């Protein structure tokens, strides 16, 4: 199956698993399965490819070995393309890879499935807002300030970690909360953090409310590792459409597949199908 498909590879040296050793191991694993890479895109030094460029080069498959944020950008850039995208776990949490291939599935096993032809093109539902779409998930509210701690950790900036952790703790405890307005659900005085997880059954929505400093720190640690549900949370529902509003008419901070954006004081969230085929090797969600 693999040898006849012209493939390009997208990598990002800033992603969690994109060390030189990891990239060498990836190329070796691809070669062992006769999957030939015609060109490697080193994002962000190289621009992400678009459908016109890929079609002109005869590319039928793009393999993406990055974190969820770069994956989001790459898949968005390929909207409308008639080829296929293979997602590999090249980041820290690799939530989209989990969705497509299963929890804890290594790159080599995914490539084995591809080589065997044990794949299916799918167009999973995304969670959408005015600033973008999320295939892995959205976080909404002042608690998203913990992303600055994560970035400082990525840069090994210990001073930045300490400073941003203090700011994130303050934002989580005193920042303007957000609440589910349409439909009305949950606490009227809102949540420091709401998580939106897209699936083929719509958007799963969970809210987090701290009961003390220990809960705030627990949730911050969970957020840093992109494991929201390890912190204290409550299920608010499953929706195809909803509106989240600020409790004090302040702009709403969001993380879209881990990347920060700012919305207005009220924001609509809907679902839509991905606009390019992704290769799945597991039943997913």
Language model: regions and residue ranges:
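Short, well-ordered alpha-helix to beta-strand connector turns
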Residues: 59, 82, 191-193, 238-240, ...
């Amino acid at each position: 199956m693999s040898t006849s498909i012209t493939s390009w590879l997208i990598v990002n040296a800033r992603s969690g698993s994109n060390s030189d050793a990891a990239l060498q191991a990836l190329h070796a694993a691809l070669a062992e399965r006769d999957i030939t890479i015609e060109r490697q895109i080193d994002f962000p030094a190289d621009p992400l490819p678009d459908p016109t460029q890929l079609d002109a080069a005869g590319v039928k498959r793009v393999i993406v070995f990055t974190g969820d944020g770069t994956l989001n950008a790459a898949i968005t850039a390929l909207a409308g393309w008639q080829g296929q995208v293979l997602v590999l776990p090249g980041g820290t949490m690799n939530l989209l890879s989990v969705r497509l291939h299963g929890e804890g599935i290594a790159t080599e096993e995914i490539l084995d499935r591809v080589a065997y032809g044990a794949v299916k093109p799918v167009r999973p539902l995304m969670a959408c807002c005015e600033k973008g779409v999320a295939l892995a998930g959205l976080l909404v509210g002042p608690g998203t300030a913990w992303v600055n701690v994560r970035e400082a950790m990525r840069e090994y900036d210990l001073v930045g970690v300490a400073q941003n952790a203090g700011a994130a703790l303050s934002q989580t405890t005193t920042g303007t909360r957000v609440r589910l307005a349409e439909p009305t659900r949950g606490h009227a005085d809102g949540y420091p953090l709401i998580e939106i997880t897209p699936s083929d059954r719509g958007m799963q929505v969970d809210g987090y409310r701290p009961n003390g400093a220990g809960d705030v720190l627990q949730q911050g640690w969970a957020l840093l590792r992109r494991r929201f549900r390890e912190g204290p949370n409550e299920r608010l529902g499953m929706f195809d459409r909803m509106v989240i509003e600020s409790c004090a008419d302040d702009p709403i901070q969001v993380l879209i597949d881990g990347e920060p954006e700012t919305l207005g004081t009220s924001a609509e969230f809907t679902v839509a199908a991905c606009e390019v085929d992704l290769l799945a090797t597991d039943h997913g969600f």
